[in-house]
Every structure is written in C-alpha cells, then in structure tokens.
C-alpha cells in the first residue's frame, strides 16, 4: 500500500514503487540519476543535481540553470523562466495559474516539506517553512495582525499574485531566503494575495494542463534524442509482455 498523503510520503511511496531493481549490474547506465529519490517529470531541469539533492520532486516546472536546490525540495507548476533562485533545504514551491483578480497571473506558494498548515499564524508554535510563522514574519518586517488577525495558516492570505515574472522572482527569494530585500517586501505587501484554501478554487486548470503538455512534448523529444542512455529503451519486452 502506497499512500500519497503528505509531501514526504509522496516521495517515499514513489521511491518504493520505482526502486525495484536492486542488482546494479542490471542497470545499463549507472550515474544517470545522482540519487534514487530524485523525481523529475513533465519538466525542464537545467540546473545540476547531485547526491545531496535527495527527496527532490520536480513536476510541470521549469528549473533553470541559475536555480540552486539544497535537497528535500518539491517544485510544481513553475512556468518557463530565467530566474536566479536559492531554494533552501526543505523548502518547496508551488505556482498556480490564476485569472482573478488579475488575468494570466500566477500565485506564488512557497512552503515547507514538513509544514502541517494549521494553527493561528500569530502563535509561536505555528510553523511555516520550518520556522515559527511569527519568526518568519518578524525577520521580514511583517505584522501578521495587520494582514489577517488570528487566521489559521491554511486560511491566511500570504501567497502573492502577480502577472510580472520578475516581481514573482523577487518575492519568491524574499519569502524563502533573502529576507532583507525591502523592495520585495513592498511588492508582497501591495500584491493581491490568496490563502491555501482559495488556491484550489481559483486555479486555472486548463492553463496548468497546457503547460504540462508543453513540457511533456519537450521531454519526449529529449528522450528520443537520448535513446542510448534512456531507461525506457532498456525495457525487457518479454518481461513487459
């Protein structure tokens, strides 16, 4: 039984399903995947990954050459970009296409691998991206009481919406690592925001699927060109039959 419940369980269950070959001599090309718990699908990944990037999941996303990932990162929904991003250990990112209140916009939702997403955001034991939510806000000069008093984290409108990819890049880095960026703070304060509860209601699933199909098409072209090293061309057809 494989349970796709929490973020960590999604990776651990997929790892259990996929790692069925224990005799490394049966794998024609070793070293293609630097760690068994790295999963990339329907995505463009241009940054170098190593064995330090365990528990990494990239789906329907563009991770450019200027991205730095440190392990235990889940990245979903990120459109093509040329961003410079430093995603710390255990920090994840979901981007959701939204057309309200701005058309052709994206909501930016960074979160922690182990976030429970519950609890009053003003209480010290409510965590966000691995730290107290109140500490996260204090480091960034944000007064949570001014934004949404006594909100549960799941219902707190902290995820900014923008049509501007450069603004989204700036706000992302401010939210996950560069807490001292004053201009990014102002962008975040002025931007319309949604909560986790609202994302599923407002997501434009057609845009999300169109992006996935575009990435998949690019992946299939790359797989065909890389047939000498692709695991799909190693399939034993007798076993499959």
Give the role of each language-model region:
Residues 1-241:
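Left-handed beta-helix
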């Amino acid at each position: 039984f494989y349970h796709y419940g929490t973020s960590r369980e999604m990776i651990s269950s997929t790892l259990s399903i996929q790692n069925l070959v224990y005799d490394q001599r049966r794998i024609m090309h070793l070293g293609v995947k630097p760690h068994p718990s790295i999963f990339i699908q329907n995505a463009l990944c241009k940054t170098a990954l190593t064995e330090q990037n365990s528990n990494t999941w990239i789906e329907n996303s563009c991770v450019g050459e200027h991205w730095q990932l440190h392990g235990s990162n889940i990245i979903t929904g990120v459109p093509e970009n040329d961003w410079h991003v430093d995603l710390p250990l255990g920090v994840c990112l979901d981007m959701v296409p939204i057309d309200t209140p701005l058309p052709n916009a994206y909501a930016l939702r960074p979160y922690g691998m182990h976030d429970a997403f519950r609890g009053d955001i003003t209480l010290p034991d409510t965590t966000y991206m691995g730290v107290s939510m109140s500490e996260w806000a204090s480091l960034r000069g944000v007064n949570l009481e001014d934004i949404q008093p006594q909100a549960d984290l799941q219902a707190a409108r902290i995820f900014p919406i923008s049509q501007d990819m450069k603004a989204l890049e700036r706000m992302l880095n401010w939210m996950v690592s560069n807490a001292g960026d004053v201009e990014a703070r102002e962008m975040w304060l002025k931007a319309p925001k949604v909560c986790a509860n609202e994302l599923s209601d407002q997501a434009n699933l057609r845009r999300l699927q169109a992006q996935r199909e575009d990435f998949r098409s690019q992946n299939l072209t790359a797989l065909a060109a890389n047939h000498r090293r692709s695991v799909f061309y190693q399939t034993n057809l007798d076993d499959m039959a």
